[in-house]
Each structure stands twice: as structure tokens, then as C-alpha cells.
Swiss-Prot record:
Cell membrane listed as a keyword: yes
Function: Involved in protein export. The function of the beta subunit is unknown, but it may be involved in stabilization of the trimeric complex.
InterPro entries (alphabetical): Preprot_translocase_SecG, SecG/Sec61-beta/Sbh
Record keywords: Cell membrane, Membrane, Protein transport, Translocation, Transmembrane, Transmembrane helix, Transport
GO cellular component: plasma membrane
Subunit structure: Component of the protein translocase complex. Heterotrimer consisting of alpha (SecY), beta (SecG) and gamma (SecE) subunits. Can form oligomers of the heterotrimer.
Membrane topology, Extracellular segments: 56-57
Residues on Cytoplasmic side: 1-33
Protein name: Preprotein translocase subunit SecG
Membrane topology: Single-pass membrane protein
Residue stretches spanning the membrane: 34-55
Family statement drawn from the similarity comment of this UniProt entry: Belongs to the SEC61-beta family.
Taxonomic path: Archaea, Thermoproteota, Thermoprotei, Thermoproteales, Thermoproteaceae
Organism: Pyrobaculum neutrophilum (strain DSM 2338 / JCM 9278 / NBRC 100436 / V24Sta)
Length: 57
């Protein structure tokens, strides 16, 4: 529970450790919602799987 409270006000990407920023204000430049990030990652994984099926190493 303590971990959840500590990350309560943070962006989900920063809280998950997916994005690290050294300067304040860098986060505002990215206009990506968590829902769109999930959609993009699923599409990327699907594309990689299709490419592996078409042309295996």
C-alpha cells in the first residue's frame, strides 16, 4: 500500500519507471495518454509477431 500512496500524483509512465526525466517540464511535451500508449504497444507487438511469422530468422 505504501508504494501506491507514494506514486499517487505521478504520471503512470513515470510511476511505472517507463519514462525518466531529469528536468521538470519535459513530461508536458509528450501528449500521449495511457490508453494510446497501450494501443501503440499492442500494435507494435502484433506487427513484430506478423513479421516473425512471415520471415522467421
Amino acid at each position: 500500500m505504501a508504494r501506491r500512496r507514494r506514486y499517487e500524483g505521478l504520471n503512470p509512465f513515470v510511476a511505472a519507471g517507463l519514462i525518466k526525466f531529469s528536468e521538470e517540464g519535459e513530461l508536458e511535451r509528450i501528449k500521449l495518454t495511457p490508453k494510446s500508449a497501450v494501443v501503440i504497444s499492442v500494435a507494435l507487438i502484433a506487427a513484430i509477431l506478423v513479421l516473425n511469422l512471415i520471415h522467421p530468422l
